[in-house]
Amino acid sequence: MDPAASSCMRSLQPPAPVWGCLRNPHSEGNGASGLPHYPPTPFSFHXXPDFPATATAAYPDFSASCLAATPHSLPQEEHIFTEQHPAFPQSPNWHFPVSXARRRPNSGPAGGSKEMGTSSLGLVDTTGGPGEDYGVLGSTANXXEKKSSRRRKESSDNQENRGKPEGSSKARKERTAFTKEQLRELEAEFAHHNYLTRLRRYEIAVNLDLSERQVKVWFQNRRMKWKRVKGGQPVSPNGQDPEDGDSTASPSSE
């Protein structure tokens, strides 16, 4: 071990540490005014690390006791010194009240949190713009889809409406396919009577395996054809007017 360090360990009262000189620039003035230095703590309370000889050689002004002093003991020593010497001038930048010391560290994060909150709100506001744009685009897309679906429905309805008259016209244009025997019997009956009674129409329909409506429609068409061929409104073969004959022969046929 270095002889300087060993002598420091043996001495019970080492010289005043340099921390007071460093902390107080008016150390010389204090000596002149008669204020004694605060009592140093014995070296036995602190650990004795082995310092190389180069440290003492490089810093001859520093004693071994100053090098051996640990930082965690400094606040206690300062507290003891301030209690023993209350008249010693203290700088406001060095010591703060406990309440102010507790509030100041919290004020920073609080202000930071407020700033963070405002910044986060700003971020939300700034990011809200694209979200609104996307919402507008989505609404326009939905409106376009609805319009297209409506157009499709309207077109389908129009096609159905167009198809319905065609179907009805086709149904109307459907004609009964009469056989040769049926046509022969109908022509023979028309040669005798242009208008049929209801009972005679029923008999012909049963004999020819037709409906009364089919027989009635055939006679109507046959009369129109006969009128076109002869021209004008002819007299019935029986010498009766067609209106009168139809009304007298079959009052309930129509």
UniProtKB/Swiss-Prot annotation:
Q: Which Pfam families does the record cross-reference, listed alphabetically?
A: Homeodomain
The UniProt keywords, alphabetically, are: Activator, Cytoplasm, Developmental protein, DNA-binding, Homeobox, Nucleus, Repressor, Transcription, Transcription regulation
Q: Name one GO molecular function term.
A: sequence-specific DNA binding
Q: Where is this region: Disordered?
A: 86-178, 226-254
Q: Which stretches are tagged as biased composition: Basic and acidic residues?
A: 154-178
One GO process term, biological-process aspect:
somite development
Function in brief? Mesodermal transcription factor that plays a key role in somitogenesis and is specifically required for sclerotome development. Required for maintenance of the sclerotome polarity and formation of the cranio-cervical joints. Binds specifically to the promoter of target genes and regulates their expression. Activates expression of NKX3-2 in the sclerotome. Activates expression of CDKN1A and CDKN2A in endothelial cells, acting as a regulator of vascular cell proliferation. While it activates CDKN1A in a DNA-dependent manner, it activates CDKN2A in a DNA-independent manner.
Annotated protein name in UniProt: Homeobox protein MOX-1
Q: Which organism is it from?
A: Pan troglodytes (Chimpanzee)
